[in-house]
């Protein structure tokens, strides 16, 4: 038995709203061990909704709808489902009373069109909404088919899912197995290069291993169906350790780890501090660091040295370095890193200088050329050269530069 998620709303098709409901429900279905192979997004059109139901009915036995439960004329989910299964609607008195009470709490009378939200197909059970006015339903229109409907508001949907739908599904025998996944995260290696290193793992059937690209990183998802999360972890653990050993320093964390959170944890463990000097990233590196709770333990501050005179006056970069090597150069990056480390009194200094575009590139230093300087606790400076090209644009170059700068520091911390 499989489930299919059907999200209703023209605003979703137009890209006006991020469809976070489908992501959440997919994760929840995996947690409950309910197979889920398809998702559908359909606009507020009765005939197209019916076609979506007909298609989903052929390949799933649990249909989960979100959206289209409001009081306006374009909220059509409930009546369209009822019409598809040729079932009349009936007004639920308890829903009317609940909606009236919620309006009374705000000092307003219930609008006439809200009565529409109390209509449910004959035989359907109420899926109560504790916070909003749009209830859902639990309905078996056919013996081998379960329909669950939820409002499109994510907070309401999640509360109804956890509070009502999950207990119901568990009472029907679901949730006895789980599909647990662990995501391994890698930095400084491309998806194809990583795939070559771990290709033998892709043929496994339990657990399964699959690569996918994240923003500025590569990820491997290891998934395992099992009777419990603890058992799934036991199965996954040795596979994950093998992959991490093969990847070496290209592996930086798992699941919710970010490159900034890992760097922060390493600095905190060592009792060390860092400061940053940024040119083309304009504060992006500092932002990644300060996104982490408690980052004041190890991050002392930074200088945005966009103008060359700021590099000279605030960071102490020798004017001759800029004149003869250029503002975008290994020498300037190293001098900036040393300067910010010395002036802020930290153990480490990181600096970024580069050409993010869309202008400023030359044949010698094209757009996407970025130098990262690193000053260590011994006062020694080093650098790496990043060459992104200009295909993905300015913001992508800036973001990747900040991530790669942190990764450069991570590798030094983990190897020293």
From Swiss-Prot:
SUPFAM superfamilies, sorted: CinA-like, Molybdenum cofactor biosynthesis proteins
Superkingdom, taxonomy of origin: Bacteria
CDD domains xrefs: cinA (cd00885)
InterPro entries, sorted: CinA (IPR050101), CinA-like_C (IPR036653), CinA_C (IPR008136), CinA_KH (IPR041424), Competence-induced_CinA (IPR008135), MoaB/Mog-like_dom_sf (IPR036425), MoaB/Mog_dom (IPR001453)
Similarity comment: Belongs to the CinA family.
PANTHER family listed in its UniProt record: NICOTINAMIDE-NUCLEOTIDE AMIDOHYDROLASE PNCC (PTHR13939), NMN AMIDOHYDROLASE-LIKE PROTEIN YFAY (PTHR13939:SF0)
Annotated HAMAP family: CinA_B
Protein name, entry field: CinA-like protein
Organism, scientific name: Synechocystis sp. (strain ATCC 27184 / PCC 6803 / Kazusa)
